[in-house]
Amino acid sequence: MPGTPVSDLSAAAAVDAPALLPLPVARPSAPAVVRGKLYIKTHGCQMNEYDSAKMADVLAASEGLELTDNPEEADVVLVNTCSIREKAQEKVFSQLGRWKALKAGGKPVIIGVGGCVASQEGEAIVKRAPYVDLVFGPQTLHRLPELIRARRESGKSQVDISFPEIEKFDRLPEPRAEGPSAFVSIMEGCSKYCSFCVVPYTRGEEVSRPFEDVLVEVAQLAAQGVREINLLGQNVNAYRGAYGADAGDAAQYADLGLLIRTIAQIEGIGRIRFTTSHPLEFSDSLVDAYRDVPQLANYLHLPVQAGSDRILSAMKRGYTALEFKSKIRKLRAVRPDISISSDFIVGFPGETEADFEKTMKLIEDVGFDQSFSFVYSRRPGTPASDLQDDTPEAVKQARLARLQAHINAHAASISQSMVGSVQRVLVEGPSRRDPNELTGKSENMRPVNFPGNPRLIGQFVDVLITEAMSNSLRGRIQLDDSAQ
């Protein structure tokens, strides 16, 4: 695999494609000396989950802090916040109020607030809750060791919510695998500025990690036994990773399609996913990757938000319902049975019954498998927060219930249709409900539970689906020599 030219991947990828560098083999590092305990409470998206894991890595490497699930025994207590939903700030201050007691009796506990609410509120958090020691944004989590030391040395609260572009990734420890599936962040921020969204203001505009840096991280994880890579970004399919800028050469850029093709060549990687996407950036290059790369999961999460062109325009999404459906048709031409999930906002300011019916028509036409659906939540500082909203809350809730019921019914029919089929499942570990069984996910993100030998954990197995449950599937392994 080392030295394999990316230009060999396909004719489509051959134009100005980089050659793969020899990728390092990850070697286990000596465990840090444990000098204290760390507790992290995480709210929000998968990007926050990834960031929290990196906080733990940074503080384990530099401060010797070991994770605990009990804040009362922790030396450092952090909350990684999300500002997408309504009343996010109040929920954070409520959490902080409960933690204030941790400092009783002069215990030198460090309390920190990170994430998107931290970016929005900054110094205001310390003014309202002066017992908070650290406030840091998503782009400055790598500076946690310096912030903690500065707090202890100066006795003053530390606030750093700057946007130092890609510096964060340059200063993180080598990745540590914690199971057969891993998240890899390939970009930060968003430059779309949808009228309802705070992400560009809390995480900054789009910045992509260099192409080769991503490949190195994936190779390190693969060497540690990771078999499934989940590529992360607020607008992940806008990825433009620089390469080939040595010796004064002008940089070239790899898009998500080329990144996926290249990751698929890394030994050990058997499945690739990515989230979250924007329809505007769903390119023909990505469709071609679905056509050509069998490791790319037969699943796509593509948030559409609404089916009314009038509402999509007010949201500043940049596409029409017809344009969205056109992209889905292109994708299904190369992956006819792909599962597609989406996001919907119900009750956006000015949404009429006719607008909502157009959303339901889009749902029917596309046949979404799953959705993350919410009633519109006004976010201060966004353009949509100034729009008049005169739709009664009861009407919004009724629309949401109808939308979710429709998608849930369709998802149930898909699950039922999988009975009798053989699904490729990555074995993640013992089932939560029955430790004598194994569990993993199908390509279309359904949990699958089945009897099996624990030594199969971390491997792909073929499972015959025998029963569809409300939120999962049951099955049995199609036996071969390795599964005996």
Swiss-Prot record:
Which parts of the sequence are annotated with region: Disordered?
Answer: 428-450
User: Which Pfam families did the record assign?
Assistant: Radical_SAM (PF04055), TRAM (PF01938), UPF0004 (PF00919)
- Cofactor needs: [4Fe-4S] cluster
Domain named Radical SAM core: residues: 176-415
E.C. number: 2.8.4.3
Give the family this protein belongs to, as stated in its UniProt record. Answer: Belongs to the methylthiotransferase family. MiaB subfamily.
Q: Which NCBIfam families match?
A: miaB-methiolase (TIGR01574), MiaB/RimO family radical SAM methylthiotransferase (TIGR00089)
List the protein's name.
Answer: tRNA-2-methylthio-N(6)-dimethylallyladenosine synthase
Coding gene?
miaB
